[in-house]
Regions:
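Class I SAM-dependent methyltransferase SAM/SAH-binding core
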Residues: 16-82
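S-adenosyl-L-methionine-dependent methyltransferase catalytic module, highlighting the catalytic core
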Residues: 61-82, 105, 109-111, 115, ...
Length: 271
């Protein structure tokens, strides 16, 4: 890893009880928690064969070591059932939550596996400095609605929103300068392609990996403060952190601290 990558990992871990056991979700080729130093379980929603296949096709993974995961968190299956119900003390998810179709339900399952006082470290892309620039931030109503609907795959609406409103960020965009109108932006997909993919995922029950939710530091705090105040999520928010050592301009970090021992999903963490 580069010095910046090491600094980034050290900052995220500095707020976590890494002397105890934890979990990192979807580390891919950029794990935050070094399992040669810490007692951490690596988990992904796909198995090791699929992870290695994806890495082989990803130019960004060239020359990178892709660690094996210890367990598969199968979509629609509670996390505790996938890893065993051994209590954990922290969880890390870097650039993962935005891909999850039911973010509140997903976070509840993670909290169910943590001891009271346990921490979840979440690194997210900032809409204001990413391919999601032209999209609307995810709302409180959407987060709660998805937790009621419980989609196990990105929905046609989520697919449609991502494909039809994101743009191709090739790393040269100056987000500090005035941005062009969306109609002038370079896109990965046309509106017609977005419609076709949305119809396809419904017709074929296909899992298409997209950014299901869109966040800024302020919007995340606003939405999850309301979720917590509404009694839907027993946690305390710590952060957000931007511009921390080794971070990129297009990301931010927030921690959620579990404040209750009650099960959130109906699956007791100790059973």
């Amino acid at each position: 890893m580069t010095e910046a990558e090491v600094a980034r990992c050290e900052f995220v871990c500095s707020h976590l009880p890494t002397e105890q056991r934890g979990i990192e979700i979807a580390p891919y080729f950029h794990p935050i928690v070094d399992r040669s130093r810490f007692d951490v379980i690596y988990v992904d929603c796909i198995d090791n064969d699929e992870i290695q296949r994806k890495a082989a096709e990803n130019p960004g993974a060239a020359g990178k070591t892709v660690p094996l995961v210890d367990a598969v968190w199968t979509p629609g299956v509670p996390l505790g059932d996938c890893i065993g119900h051994e209590p954990l003390h922290y969880a890390v998810a870097s650039h993962v939550l935005e891909h999850v179709p039911n973010p509140l339900g997903w976070l509840k399952e993670i909290l169910d596996c943590l001891e009271p006082g346990g921490l979840v470290a979440i690194v997210l892309p900032n809409r204001e400095r990413s391919m999601d620039y032209y999209r609307q931030p995810t709302s409180f109503a959407q987060v709660v609605g998805w937790s009621i609907e419980k989609p196990a795959r990105p929905t046609p609406t989520q697919v449609m929103d991502f494909l039809s409103q994101s743009f191709e960020d090739d790393g040269t965009v100056d987000f500090d300068a005035p941005m062009a109108a969306f109609a002038e932006a370079k896109r990965h997909y046309t509106d017609l392609q977005a419609i076709e993919f949305a119809e396809f995922v419904l017709r074929e029950s296909h899992y298409l990996d997209v950014h299901c939710s869109v966040w800024t530091p302020d919007s995340f705090i606003d939405v999850f403060s309301r979720v917590i105040t509404g009694g839907l999520f027993p946690a305390k928010i710590i952060g957000p952190f931007t511009g921390f050592p080794g971070s990129t301009p297009g990301e931010f970090l927030v921690y959620l601290e579990k404040t209750s021992s009650a099960s959130l999903t109906g699956s007791p963490a100790g059973s």
